[in-house]
Amino acid sequence: MEFIISFLPAFGIVALFFVFWKNSWVSKQPVGDEKMSNIAKNIAEGAMSFLKAEYKILSVFVVAVAVLLVFKGNSEEGSNSMVAVSFVVGAICSALAGFIGMKVATKANVRTTNAARSSLAKALEVAFAGGSVMGLGVVGLGVLGLSSLFMIYSSMEWGTNIEMVLNVLSGFSLGASSIALFARVGGGIYTKAADV
């Protein structure tokens, strides 16, 4: 069991290598004419501006919740303040996955449109490659983050208590889910405003 767990971070790294490989492949696809390129550039700039503004606000939320988790971990019996570390790592992994997804989505959109001019099969290939970057980015960061934290916590003095380790690791899910929720709601509002 321990042998398998020690290899888990490597699987996360392999997934991230695949992400960067597919991202570079999508980037090499032709963008199209100047009008398409300009529209794509404006969409990408708007999306990244939104993401920066959203992440600034979310960083305040993450710090505030982490402080509360430290306080709760130190004041309640059977709890551990390290859950705050798991929360922050989960939030960072989720935010990084969102950043990667936004970058590749804005790249893949225009390239898929351009590929559709020549063939539907080529457009599907570009679109699928763009989607796989986001999917494997989430998986790679999740596996890397969780398995690394598990190995670190297991080596601590309280690491022999598997129930405590799993309770502390639950902070990772809370951090990742919190960022994903805010990104989903905020992104929906942003795209609706852009439509209007």
PLM region descriptions:
Residues 1-196:
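Hydrophobic, small-residue-rich transmembrane alpha-helices and their short perimembrane loops
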